[in-house]
């Protein structure tokens, strides 16, 4: 009879400890901006960028991801790539 009571108490303690888990955290953020202008009778994109950030702990470790994209009709490909690199380092 004593063994049964000890097993029940031990089981209750184990269930109580294992059910006390940390909360799952997930945060997502997204922003986008665009500017266009008529130049020489044509609508040109001065800049178009979007940024997405997310943080979660699905694996038990906080994981942060950052994605950014940039485009422009009036900038050179080298300038566009430079801006993309700066956005991805933020």
Swiss-Prot record:
InterPro entries tied to this protein: Acp26Ab
Q: Which organism is it from?
A: Drosophila melanogaster
Predominant subcellular localization, coarse grouping: secreted
- Cellular localization per UniProt: Secreted, Extracellular space; Cytoplasm
Q: What is the effect of changing residue 77 to R?
A: In strain: TW9
A GO cellular component term found in this entry reads: cytoplasm
Q: Function, please?
A: This protein is transferred from male to female during mating and may affect egglaying and behavior after mating.
- Phenotype when changing residue 64 to H: In strain: AF1, AF2, AF3, AF5, AF6, AF7, AF8, AF9, AF10, Au4, Au7, Au8, La3, La10, La13, La14, La15, La28, La31, La32, La36, La37, La54, La58, La60, La62, La105, La106, La116, La118, La120, La125, Ma3, Ma6, Ma11, Ma18, Ma20, Ma21, Ma23, Ma24, Ma31, Ma35, Ma37, Ma43, Ma50, Ma53, Ma56, Ma57, Ma60, Ma74, Mo29b, Mo40b, Mo52b, NC-003, NC-004, NC-006, NC-008, NC-009, Ny2, Ny3, Ny4, Ny5, TW1, TW2, TW5, TW6, TW7, TW8, TW10 and TW11
Entry keyword set: Behavior, Cytoplasm, Secreted, Signal
Provide the leader sequence positions: 1-21
| One GO BP | mating behavior
Please give the superkingdom of this protein's source.
Eukaryota
Give expression by tissue. Main cells and secondary cells of the accessory glands of 1 day old virgin males (at protein level). In 5 day old virgin males, only detected in the secondary cells (at protein level). Reappears in the main cells after mating (at protein level). First detected in adult males 3-4 hr after eclosion, levels increase reaching a peak at day 3-5 which is maintained until at least day 10 of adulthood (at protein level). In unmated male adults, levels are maintained for the first 6 days of adulthood and then gradually decrease for at least the next 8 days. No expression in females.
Protein name, as recorded: Accessory gland-specific peptide 26Ab
Asked whether the keyword Signal is assigned, the reply is yes
Q: Describe how expression is induced or repressed.
A: Up-regulated in response to mating.
């Amino acid at each position: 009879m004593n063994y049964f009571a000890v097993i029940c108490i031990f089981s209750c303690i184990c269930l109580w400890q294992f059910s006390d888990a940390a909360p799952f955290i997930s945060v997502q953020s997204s922003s986008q901006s665009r500017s266009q202008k008529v130049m020489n009778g044509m609508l040109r994109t001065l800049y178009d960028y979007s940024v997405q950030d997310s943080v979660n702990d699905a694996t038990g470790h906080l994981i942060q991801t950052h994605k950014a994209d940039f485009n422009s009709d009036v900038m050179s490909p080298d300038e566009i790539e430079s801006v993309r690199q700066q956005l991805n380092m933020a």
